């Protein structure tokens, strides 16, 4: 019986660890979504700014700088999107492990009662 209790305790600790991991991943994904949204707004801002700047108003290099900034923001959006996909995969894996562990724990308790 002591072996079952020790294993049950280890299972509970592992379950708590996975639950915390899942929550941390969820927070990271929400943070990435905010970053994606912020950078998409910056892209729109720079597009609008680029429409108003004319060559007779300023030098052509300003357009190059703006385009460079826009490309940088687009790259960031892509990077955050990829990171979000990776986090989502980790979260799904943690959920699957938690379900398996919960099922195994229930089976262990069921066998211990016999």
UniProtKB/Swiss-Prot annotation:
Pfam families associated with the record: DUF496
Which region ranges are annotated with the description Disordered?
A: 89-114
Tell me where it mainly resides: cytoplasm
Q: Does the keyword rRNA processing apply?
A: no
Annotated membrane-spanning segments are: none
Write out the coiled-coil annotation as residue ranges. Answer: 70-111
Keywords, ordered alphabetically: Coiled coil, Cytoplasm
Extract one GO cellular component term from the record.
cytosol
Compartment(s) of residence: Cytoplasm
Cytoplasm as a keyword of this entry, yes or no, is yes
InterPro entries referenced in this protein's UniProt entry, alphabetically: DUF496
Q: Quote the function comment for this protein.
A: Pole-localizer protein involved in the regulation of several cellular processes.
Q: Which HAMAP family match?
A: Pole_loc_TmaR
Q: In which family does this protein belong, per the annotation?
A: Belongs to the pole-localizer TmaR family.
Mind telling me what this protein is named? Pole-localizer protein TmaR
Protein source organism: Haemophilus influenzae (strain ATCC 51907 / DSM 11121 / KW20 / Rd)
Which taxonomic lineage does the organism of this UniProt entry have? Answer: Bacteria, Pseudomonadati, Pseudomonadota, Gammaproteobacteria, Pasteurellales
* Gene that encodes it: tmaR
């Amino acid at each position: 019986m002591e072996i079952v209790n020790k294993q049950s305790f280890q299972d509970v600790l592992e379950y708590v660890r996975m639950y915390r991991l899942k929550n941390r991943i969820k927070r990271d994904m929400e943070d990435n979504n905010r970053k994606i949204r912020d950078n998409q707004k910056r892209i729109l801002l720079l597009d609008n700014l680029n429409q108003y700047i004319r060559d007779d108003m300023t030098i052509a290099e300003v357009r190059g700088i703006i385009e460079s900034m826009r490309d940088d923001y687009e790259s960031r959006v892509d990077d955050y999107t990829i990171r979000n996909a990776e986090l989502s995969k980790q979260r799904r894996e943690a959920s699957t492990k938690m379900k398996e562990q919960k099922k195994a724990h229930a089976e262990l308790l069921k066998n211990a009662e016999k």
